[in-house]
């Protein structure tokens, strides 16, 4: 039987999942996105050439891999067409390698308009969304009024359904948010112009994956964002609108939950966060600037500067718990090169003086938290591009070992640079 491996983020996203998925897909036959939308930004660097993917799975660059967008993904037709066009211009036959679930909810212009209108109305209390309509599209899905890829098979019925939902959302946009209405005809004309392209890629994803599993094929599930942004388990309300955890794999793809064999958690060697929300280890000093500059911490999707801080082992332990992680991939270790001292948060001191070694459950519980740090010597020798475990500086090895001790999870892969080749695989998830 084949192995099914999940790759997901253990922090607030931007951990380096895309590179790891691309690397491991050398052995996989299928790569599946199961949640999120084009709010993701997965950066791949292969032989020095950079590719940023937002919606299409990171396996698309591999000839032997079928990439699948599962039902848990909210799909923006315009974003998909743009991404397909960019890849096809480079000679990548996307339409031969990409398949879609007919149950994917569609993100349409009124979702984007609502997203931006709401963020503007929130003012200082804005969530910090990407403004791409992700949340409103999931709202429509749950409210059972959303349009899906399957609706594109009947264009006459689609036109009627679209008119109803455009009128519904325009009422709110115009009368409550005092912004312009979305143009129904322009939306309809565009979607119908590309409908046949999308429907040609539709398959029964659950059936396909079950057949692949029975044949012994290797399947990889690619998560987007990170565990601490999960709609249920994250720092609510400063979260995304989907289940970013391992539990989302089954519901977002149609694979049976017993058929997940290994869950790889991507953990950055320090912490970052985009947008508002709790971040106990955030640094506002020159070390924070150092991490931002050395790590090039600017969003692949929005270009926004990421907030930076020390590694939070308490938060990562929560990810271990929720996702039943099998192993870690430690990324961006090289960014810490040159620091005289590195720190890991091992607990929180609450405003009343109590110490905690677990994360609060509600956003209010994070207020006033002070991180309790454990300090370790840094290293001056470079780890950038190192491909042998034994050649890492001893202080870096000690740092890795301490992460394993604090979380109870082995580091199976170490990334020492952005390129596919700058990686050490100590234990292959497909063989674990």
From Swiss-Prot:
Active-site feature positions: 14, 42
Co-factor(s): Mg(2+)
Cofactor, free-text remark: Binds 1 Mg(2+) ion per subunit.
The protein's name in its UniProt record: Adenylosuccinate synthetase
Family: Belongs to the adenylosuccinate synthetase family.
Binding residues annotated for substrate, in chain numbering: 300-306
Reaction catalysis annotation: IMP + L-aspartate + GTP = N(6)-(1,2-dicarboxyethyl)-AMP + GDP + phosphate + 2 H(+)
Subunit relationships: Homodimer.
Transcription regulation in keyword set: no
SUPFAM superfamilies assigned to the protein according to its UniProt record, in alphabetical order: P-loop containing nucleoside triphosphate hydrolases
């Amino acid at each position: 039987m084949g192995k099914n491996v999940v790759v997901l983020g253990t922090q607030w996203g931007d951990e380096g999942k895309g590179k790891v998925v691309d690397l491991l897909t050398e052995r996989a036959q299928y790569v599946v996105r199961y949640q999120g939308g084009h709010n993701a930004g997965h950066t791949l660097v292969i032989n020095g050439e950079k590719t940023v993917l937002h919606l299409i799975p990171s396996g698309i660059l591999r000839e032997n891999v079928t990439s699948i967008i599962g039902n848990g993904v909210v799909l923006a037709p315009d974003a998909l067409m743009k991404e397909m066009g960019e890849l096809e211009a480079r000679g990548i036959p996307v339409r031969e390698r990409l398949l879609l679930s007919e149950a994917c909810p569609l993100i349409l212009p009124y979702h984007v308009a609502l997203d931006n209108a709401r963020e503007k109305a929130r003012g200082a209390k804005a969530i910090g969304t990407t403004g791409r309509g992700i949340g409103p599209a999931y709202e429509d899905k749950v409210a059972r009024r959303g349009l899906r890829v399957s609706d594109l098979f009947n264009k006459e019925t689609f036109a009627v359904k679209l008119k109803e939902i455009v009128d519904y959302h325009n009422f709110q946009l115009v009368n409550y948010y005092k912004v312009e209405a979305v143009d129904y005809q322009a939306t309809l004309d565009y979607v119908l112009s590309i409908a046949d392209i999308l429907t040609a890629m539709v398959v029964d994803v659950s059936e396909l994956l079950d057949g692949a599993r029975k044949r012994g094929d290797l399947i990889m599930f690619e998560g987007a964002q990170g565990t601490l942004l999960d709609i249920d388990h994250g720092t609510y309300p400063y979260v995304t609108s989907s289940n970013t955890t391992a539990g989302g794999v089954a519901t977002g793809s149609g694979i049976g939950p017993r058929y997940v064999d290994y869950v790889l958690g991507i953990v950055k060697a320090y912490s970052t966060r985009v947008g508002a929300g709790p971040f106990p280890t955030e640094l506002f000093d020159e070390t924070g600037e150092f991490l931002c500059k050395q790590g090039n911490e600017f969003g692949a999707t929005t270009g926004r500067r990421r907030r930076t801080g020390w590694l939070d082992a308490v938060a990562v332990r929560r990810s271990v718990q929720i996702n039943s992680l099998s192993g870690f991939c430690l990324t961006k270790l090289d960014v810490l090169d040159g620091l005289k001292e590195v720190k890991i948060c091992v607990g929180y001191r609450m405003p009343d003086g109590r110490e905690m070694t677990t994360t609060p459950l509600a956003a209010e519980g994070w207020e006033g938290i002070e991180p309790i740090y454990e300090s370790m010597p840094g290293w001056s020798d470079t780890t950038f591009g190192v491909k042998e475990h034994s050649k890492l500086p001893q202080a870096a090895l000690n740092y890795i070992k301490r992460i394993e001790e604090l979380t109870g999870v082995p580091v199976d892969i170490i990334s020492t640079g952005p390129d596919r080749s700058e990686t050490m695989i100590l234990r292959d998830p497909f063989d674990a």
